[in-house]
Amino acid sequence: MAKVSSSLLKFAIVLILVLSMSAIISAKCIKNGKGCREDQGPPFCCSGFCYRQVGWARGYCKNR
């Protein structure tokens, strides 16, 4: 019974680590509708596209 509990605990720890890493990675990008500048460095848009028209100082993130 102790082996089942320790392997379940290990699985839970790994699962928590993976979920927290994915949350950190996704937090490093700008969500759609938020302001962005494609000519500056990170963070970049999560969608990979910063819509900006001529004359605008900043654009906003959106899907293509």
From Swiss-Prot:
Domain of life the protein comes from: Eukaryota
Protein's name according to its UniProt entry: Antimicrobial peptide 1
InterPro entries: Antimicrobial_C6_CS, Gurmarin/antifun_pep, Gurmarin/antimicrobial_peptd
Alphabetically ordered keywords of this record: Antibiotic, Antimicrobial, Disulfide bond, Fungicide, Knottin, Plant defense, Secreted, Signal
GO BP of this protein: defense response to bacterium; defense response to fungus; killing of cells of another organism
Protein transport keyword on record: no
GO cellular-component term (any): extracellular region
Disulfide bonds: C29-C46, C36-C50, C45-C61
Membrane-spanning parts: none
Annotated function: Possesses antifungal and antibacterial activity.
Similarity comment text for this entry: Belongs to the AMP family.
Organism the protein comes from: Mesembryanthemum crystallinum
Comment on protein domains: The presence of a 'disulfide through disulfide knot' structurally defines this protein as a knottin.
Key word Disulfide bond present: yes
